[in-house]
Structures are given as C-alpha cells and as structure tokens.
Amino acid sequence: MRLYRDRAVVLRQHKLGEADRIVTLLTRDHGLVRAVAKGVRRTRSKFGSRLEPFAHIDAQLHPGRNLDIVTQVVSIDAFAADIVNDYGRYTCGCAMLETAERLAGEERAPAPALHRLTVGALRAVADGSRPRDLLLDAYLLRAMGIAGWAPALTECARCATPGPHRAFHIAAGGSVCPHCRPAGSTTPPLGVLDLMSALHDGDWEAAQGAPQSHRSYVSGLVAAHLQWHLERQLKTLPLVERFYQADRSVAERRAALIGQDSECG
C-alpha cells in the first residue's frame, strides 16, 4: 500500500520492545491512527522528540495490517515545551488529549473539526493568556458539540421551547423548561448557563468576567455531562480538579493577606 501524509496531534505513546514506541495520533484526514515509531527511543533517533504528546506534526506513514509505521515526521508546533513545565497547563492539556481520543470515534474516520479544535486549544494552553479552567471547559463543550453531545443551553432539551430555562438535567440533555423538567434536575445560579453558552460560542470577554463561583459550577456540569455520555469519568479530570482547588486556596490566602496588609496600613 502507498505511503500517506497527514497532519496530526500526538495524543499518547507507550514503549514497544527495546527501541520502539507505539504512538496514538489524532490526524486531520484519517482520524485516530495508531502507529509504530521505530527506533525513536535510541539517542540517535531523527524524530523521537517530535513524537512526544502535545506535538503538532506533519507525518508520513506506511499503512500496516494492525498498526501503521511512521516513516517521517516534520514538526509544525512544539506545544510541549510550554505545557509540560507548568503543572496546571500540563493537567489541562492531558485532559484535552484524553477527551480527543475518547471522542474521535472509530479509527481512520476523518476528524477535521476535532483535529482543528484540539490544535487551537493546545495553542491557547501553551500561550497561557487565558484561564486554564475556562479553556478546558470551552474545549470539552465544543468537542461534545462535534460528537453530537452538546448540552442544550438556549432551548429545552426535550421540547425545544426557546429559553432561557433555569433547570438543568444531565440525562435529559441540558436545560429543561418547567413543563419538561424531570425529577432530580438542578437549578444553577443565574448566569451559569450564560457562562456555558459564552464558552461554547467563544465569547471570552463574557467568560472571563464571570465570578469564580460560576466557573466552578460550570466545570462540574460540563464534567458530569461528558461523563454521562462516555459512561465513565476521564482519568485526568480528578488531577485537574485537585490542582484547581489547590490553586484557588493559594489565591484566596494571598488575597486575605493582601487585605490584612491594607487594613494595617
């Protein structure tokens, strides 16, 4: 079979034998691809460093029966350099990569929209100019939208009556009107569903102006919605949540100390 080229994001890798690795790629035109990268663990490897997770590459591959073979790699974006040295960015990026793999569908099914979204999200994480929690929730919402799982935010998930509606029910598919509201629905604080819509639509001015309490609530709803569709939690999300909790605790203590200094002055 003929060689083929495609742009790809390296999602993960694991060892094979003494010198090789198996890499999982999210490609633009061939979807999820698993391939053997021969000799990349040797110090003389020509492209071992280009096949690390978070890398955006142009790859040439040879189709195989079970696994393809990587024959050439050209680096497009080396996001890892700005992600792996910051634990907050790293956990956020790992959650994105895991989500991409879970939502990519069958192997070799073209995934141009998910590939484009993932590249843009990793670029934003590496850049560090936007809050990581908002970037992750925006990515998860949009990735679910590509998969057909986006929660209803502006209309009732059951009868499509235009909103806004106050109630939200995961199994029903998002916001629900008073007539369709099932038992067990939650009523998020005012502004929470607006924040979810802003993240989904890319209204960063509105998203970044939301209070931290709303951001935390949104993270819980988004994670629960994704978990319900995947039927299990992402392995990386607990790491993200623990980091954000610790990060917020430090920020709160810092704010308290600043307040004390102001009062003493």
From Swiss-Prot:
Q: GO:BP terms for this protein?
A: DNA recombination; double-strand break repair
Q: Which UniProt keywords apply?
A: DNA damage, DNA recombination, DNA repair
Q: Which InterPro entries match?
A: ARFGAP/RecO, DNA_rep/recomb_RecO_N, NA-bd_OB-fold, RecO, RecO_C
Any single Pfam family the record assigns to this protein: RecO_C
Renumbered to this chain, the signal peptide range is: none
Going by the entry's taxonomy, the superkingdom of the source organism is recorded as: Bacteria
GO CC annotation: what is one?
Answer: bacterial nucleoid
The family classification in the record reads: Belongs to the RecO family.
| Role | Involved in DNA repair and RecF pathway recombination.
The name of this protein is DNA repair protein RecO
